[in-house]
Amino acid sequence: WFYCAYDIGSGAFTTWVYGKSKEGIISDFYRQMVRNYAEWGMCLPAEIECESSLNSTFRETLLSEGAMFRYVRMEANKARGKYIERVWEMQRYGKEKEREGWLARPNSLRESNQKSDEDIPIIPYEEIANNCLEDIVNWNNSAHPNQEKYPGKTRWEVFLENQHPDLKSINWNMILPYIGYKTETSCKAGTIKLQRKEFFLGMNGKI
């Protein structure tokens, strides 16, 4: 399973996580998104479009409007309802289809994409994951489709160079309680020990 975030304006993938099952993948996805944007020195996007099956558990918390994102569009589970599904179609029937072990869908509308009678080899999990990661990197480093507007720029360059100046800073207070990791510690004389470091609790300039 791969779960990814895609920036519509630049056409770049900005977050990706994967695993052998869906369990826990949505929390890992949002954690990784926050890590990425914080590391890049960027604000989180103003808006997110997501499907409801995995995201509904955060509907009243992390994904309530104004918490992690200013605007949230949670779409019912229909393939044509989300923009990213068109991107997945390009990925699936583009580079992925050329790889050994590609699995066709038996009910595909196009005959060329339907399952054949040939035996499909079993590909190791690590190889599949690495191929998908390579495809994401190559996609991001490919030319932006609107070269008239962004001449000579890749999707990734357009993403980095065109962040909106009015985006709000990461709302840590609304994010950490729901996807942050918790570590128990003790407090003695206004001092907390955490990860082999000491932190002091203060108020009005006093510990």
Go through the PLM ranges and name each one.
Residues 129-207:
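C-terminal, beta-rich DNA-binding module of retroviral/retroelements integrases
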Residues 1-2, 6-127:
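RNase H-like DDE/DDD metal-dependent nuclease/strand-transfer catalytic core used by mobile genetic elements
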